[in-house]
Amino acid sequence: MGGWSSKPRKGMGTNLSVPNPLGFFPDHQLDPAFGANSNNPDWDFNPVKDDWPAANQVGVGAFGPRLTPPHGGILGWSPQAQGILTTVSTIPPPASTNRQSGRQPTPISPPLRDSHPQAMQWNSTAFHQTLQDPRVRGLYLPAGGSSSGTVNPAPNIASHISSISARTGDPVTNMENITSGFLGPLLVLQAGFFLLTRILTIPQSLDSWWTSLNFLGGSPVCLGQNSQSPTSNHSPTSCPPICPGYRWMCLRRFIIFLFILLLCLIFLLVLLDYQGMLPVCPLIPGSTTTSTGPCKTCTTPAQGNSMFPSCCCTKPTDGNCTCIPIPSSWAFAKYLWEWASVRFSWLSLLVPFVQWFVGLSPTVWLSAIWMMWYWGPSLYSIVSPFIPLLPIFFCLWVYI
C-alpha cells in the first residue's frame, strides 16, 4: 500500500497514494476530467507519492511546516516543491558551447516581405487608392488642408494628440514657459532699476559740473555756511534744507531736468520723423505761404507709392507742390531751421558761416579732429552723465 502500481484499482480508497490531481482525496471521481479513471491508473506519472498518513507528519514543503501535500502541493512534485534543495553546479559551460571568440559576421537581414509584411500592403495600389477616399482623408487631414495628393501625416498626428488631450484633460504645463515667463519681467525690472539709479545721478553730475565752473582751481564749497544760518562744510550739490544754497541747488537741478526732458523730446521727434510718422513740409523762405497753405504736403510721393511721404515741397507751381526726394531726417532738420529762422531773423546771418565751414579743406577737418582728441578726456567728463540715456534711446529707436 502506498507504492506505485500499474494495475487497475477497484473501488474508492483502496490505494492511499491519492492518484488524483488535487492531491487530497484518494481515487477521487474528478479523475475523468483529467483523462483518468480507475481503469487507467497510469495517468499520474509521479513515481514519488506520499502516503496519506504522512500528510500529518511535520515536514517542510511548499506550504510550510506541518503540511506536506501528497503530490508536493500545487507547485508540483519537483524537488524544489517538496522542500528539497539541490546544489547547482556553478561551472560555466565550455567555450565551444558558449560562444566563439572574435567578431562574428552580421547575419543577413531577412527580406522585407518576411520581416514587415504590412509594408508590402502599404506599397500596394489598393492601399493608395483607399487613401484618396474622402472618408479616409478626413481622418488624417485637417479641415481646410491641402488638396494635393502628397500625404503629410506629421501635423495631423499632433492635432490628433491635441484633440485627445482636450478630451482627457489639460496637458502638463511646460516648466520652460513658466521659467521664461518669470525671468523676463525680472530681468526687465532689474535693468529698469539699474537705469533709474544711473539716470538719477545725471542731475547730480551735471550740478557738480555746473558748480565747478565757479570754483576753478579749487574744491567747490557751499558759501551758505558764512551766512546768518551757518552749517557744516558741505558741497554745493548736497545742501541741506536749512542752508541758503538749498534753493539755488533746487533751481539748478530743475533747469537740468528741463534740459534732459528737451533732449529726450528732440530725440523722440527725430525718431518719429525717421519712421515716417511726421509728414513735415518746411516753410517757403521769402514767401508768405504758411504751413496751412496749399503747399503743406506732397500729393504724390517722389519715391514710389510708399506709405509715408519721403519728399518735401520746394516751391509752389500753380498751387501744386514740386517734390524732391529728401530723407525724412533732413526734412525734419530743415523744418526746424526754417521754423527758427522765421521767428529769429538773426539766424539767417549764420548761413554764410555754416556754408563756409562745410566747404573747408580736409586739413581743417583733420585739425578739428586733433583738437577733439586733445580735449577728449575733459569732454568725456561732461558727456559721461548722458551715457545711461543711450540704452533708452536705443530701445526707443528699435521698438518704435
Swiss-Prot record:
Residues in compartment: Virion surface: 2-181, 275-348, 399-400
Uses in biotechnology: Systematic vaccination of individuals at risk of exposure to the virus has been the main method of controlling the morbidity and mortality associated with hepatitis B. The first hepatitis B vaccine was manufactured by the purification and inactivation of HBsAg obtained from the plasma of chronic hepatitis B virus carriers. The vaccine is now produced by recombinant DNA techniques and expression of the S isoform in yeast cells. The pre-S region do not seem to induce strong enough antigenic response.
Positions of the UniProt region annotated as Pre-S: 2-174
Ranges of compositional bias, category Polar residues: 89-106
Region of interest called Disordered, as start-end residue ranges on this chain: 1-20, 89-115
Entry's transmembrane regions: 182-202, 254-274, 349-369, 376-398
Locations listed in the record: Virion membrane
Post-translational modification: Isoform M is N-terminally acetylated by host at a ratio of 90%, and N-glycosylated by host at the pre-S2 region. Myristoylated.
This protein's UniProt keywords: Acetylation, Caveolin-mediated endocytosis of virus by host, Fusion of virus membrane with host endosomal membrane, Fusion of virus membrane with host membrane, Glycoprotein, Host-virus interaction, Lipoprotein, Membrane, Myristate, Transmembrane, Transmembrane helix, Viral attachment to host cell, Viral envelope protein, Viral penetration into host cytoplasm, Virion, Virus endocytosis by host, Virus entry into host cell
One of the Pfam families matching this protein, by short name: vMSA
Domain-level remarks: The large envelope protein is synthesized with the pre-S region at the cytosolic side of the endoplasmic reticulum and, hence will be within the virion after budding. Therefore the pre-S region is not N-glycosylated. Later a post-translational translocation of N-terminal pre-S and TM1 domains occur in about 50% of proteins at the virion surface. These molecules change their topology by an unknown mechanism, resulting in exposure of pre-S region at virion surface.
Name of the protein in question: Large envelope protein
Organism of provenance: Hepatitis B virus genotype A2 subtype adw2 (strain Rutter 1979) (HBV-A)
Source taxonomy: Viruses, Riboviria, Pararnavirae, Artverviricota, Revtraviricetes
This protein's encoding gene: S
